[in-house]
Amino acid sequence: MQDERPVDQLTEAEAAAELARLAEAIEAANTAYHTHDAPQISDADYDALRLRNRAIEEQFPELRRSDSPSDRVGGALAEGFAKVRHEVRMLSLENAFDLAEVEDWIERIRRYLGHVGDLLFTAEPKIDGLSLSLRYEKGRLVQAATRGDGETGENVTENARTIADLPTELDGAPDLLEVRGEVYMSHEDFAALNGRQEAAGQRLFANPRNAAAGSLRQLDPAVTASRPLRFFAYAWGAHSEPLAATQHEAIARLAALGFTTNPLTRLCTGPEELLAQHAEIERQRAALGYDIDGVVYKVDDLALQRRLGFRASTPRWAIAHKFAAQLAWTQLEGIDVQVGRTGALSPVARLKPVTVGGVVVANATLHNEDYIAGRDSKGQEIRGGKDIRVGDWVQVYRAGDVIPKVADVDLDRRPEGAAPYRFPETCPECGSEAIREPGDSVRRCTGGLICPAQQVERLKHFVSRAAFDIEGLGAKQVEALWRDGWIRQPADIFELPNRYREGIQRLENREGWGRKSAENLFAAIEARRRIALHRLIFALGIRHVGETTATLLATHYGSWAAFEAAMTRAEVGAGPEWQDLLSIDGVGAVLATSLVTAFHQEAERAAVEALAAHLTVEDAEVRAPVASPVAGRIVVFTGTLEKMSRAEAKARAEALGAKVSGSVSARTDLVVAGPGAGSKAKQAAALGIETIDEDGWLRLIGDA
């Protein structure tokens, strides 16, 4: 991650642009890691992106995006598997990188809980594998699902049954029990698997995590059965009765039921003991025989876990304390520039292969032209101002067994005549001008849909899970059909049945296709001629428009006709349509500009009109409000709350549909005043606003 300008020095416009860039980068990283099992940046880079995103959101809360990465978990689902809705969400973890961040996490827990005595924690290795949820009913394994996006996963039940240390029957378990853990592959088994792959002339796996993920997600369970997968249990989801009263007792119960649990799990009393266990696990890391990338700390008392609850994508009661990165020196042999869906030009370092932490790596991210030149996007020096040139000896690091980043340059070993790298000002794919807008850290191709790279990437986005989700038409099929000229824009997908069902060129005659698979695809395409408005808006692939934003836009405009008309009439920066767009909660000037600009570009407009001609777009659903006595009301808490912390009260109110404000105004509906309430209570009385005490609040919401 490049050195960035301090968050407290950003202007509001710079912060908005930075949040947009971070959202795009994090979404791309999530898709590469969770969906394709082919990560493109290191764990450390990914963590840095999320940390900076969170820091900017905290500094500029009014700029928080409706599709904020802080609210997202995992990635899109792989093709070919049935979908499973998780009864209890599978969330990710907050990360810490040093003792200070661990202590801050503990202090936040204490503040949230209010009056609490000594806290106990468990510490366990963070396994670097693929998360899996196992559902047992009456002691029998009935379903296994990957995490997916946290809400919906992939059904891999038959594959999971082939894992040797995963029990298919339990004796003495609750009638319903979801056991969660990590599928992984040992170093020894990974080496043997790659040996067999090499002998058979097949592709080698980059690391054990990719091997485990790829093996579990095989469409043929026989292939999974031939792979030496293992499973550690460490958590649970839905259950008909509690496993125990504490985390460590629950883990012991899982072990008694026949699951493999990690023997390095320990009970700790505070930050010093947690740090000592972190150091001990890191000391043993090289000899464990499997990959870990940190230590997970959890509040031990399950009653406190329930009180602490969850944020949008992480539990408050757990955190992952990550290990430091691993370093190596190698030579930079070349720089390639790739073009993404939104036209971003991304430089990739081609390295002389080097082993870093036991994995051979040959590529690294170079982020953007500023990073190569030795400065951040604001012009401040990084790496002491040292630029990166082809032929340089560079220090690379990896954290999490993925493609590394370039951390430093050895000027003493720079070859004579090595020239400064000139970043292209035209697109390497289509030759269009590549421009860099103010506040943006990347250069982008202006070719739009005439750019081949953007065409194919946007087509992949169009058929993705949250967009049109056309069964049988995934990224690989899109690439092949695009390469042969069968599809160039989304509308072409809906022409496939007419063009390639009969005649000389038939889909069923293509490699990898047959009559049945072709007819199945044609049927899936026909089924998608009717589409929900929010899916269509998201599928257009307009920069900055994520799933949540698409839903907000659909809800606001109601119909495709209204949305299209508004975008067509809108002018950037002025007019009633522009003001109406900005009035949507979560839509800022950057996002609005992107939307309006897209609908005014000739090629984009033509593609949208061609697509719409094939579709029946369903109007947005009007969601029923949350049924509670405080739904839709603006609530203010003031004074000391004695039965719950302020944070706990806020979370409960918001869960019931209320909006919690920090100040009293004429728009306030209700003030909850505890002992010591001062000016806010007086202001509420002056305005005639209903005011109740904490007991009254608890009675109102039914928690008394």
UniProtKB/Swiss-Prot annotation:
Domain BRCT: 625-704
Residues at the active site: 126
Gene Ontology terms for molecular function: DNA ligase (NAD+) activity; metal ion binding
Named cofactor requirement(s): Mg(2+); Mn(2+)
GO biological process, one term: DNA replication
Reaction equation(s) it catalyzes: NAD(+) + (deoxyribonucleotide)n-3'-hydroxyl + 5'-phospho-(deoxyribonucleotide)m = (deoxyribonucleotide)n+m + AMP + beta-nicotinamide D-nucleotide
Keyword 4Fe-4S: no
A GO-annotated cellular component: cytosol
EC number, as in UniProt: 6.5.1.2
Pfam families hit by this protein: BRCT, DNA_ligase_aden, DNA_ligase_OB, DNA_ligase_ZBD, HHH_2
Binding site for NAD(+): 43-47, 92-93, 124, 147, 182, 298, 322
UniProt key word RNA-binding: no
Organism superkingdom: Bacteria
Binding site for Zn(2+): 427, 430, 445, 451
Keywords: DNA damage, DNA repair, DNA replication, Ligase, Magnesium, Manganese, Metal-binding, NAD, Zinc
Role summary: DNA ligase that catalyzes the formation of phosphodiester linkages between 5'-phosphoryl and 3'-hydroxyl groups in double-stranded DNA using NAD as a coenzyme and as the energy source for the reaction. It is essential for DNA replication and repair of damaged DNA.
HAMAP family: DNA_ligase_A (MF_01588)
PANTHER family named in the record: CHROMOSOME TRANSMISSION FIDELITY FACTOR 18, DNA LIGASE
Record family assignment: Belongs to the NAD-dependent DNA ligase family. LigA subfamily.
Protein name: DNA ligase
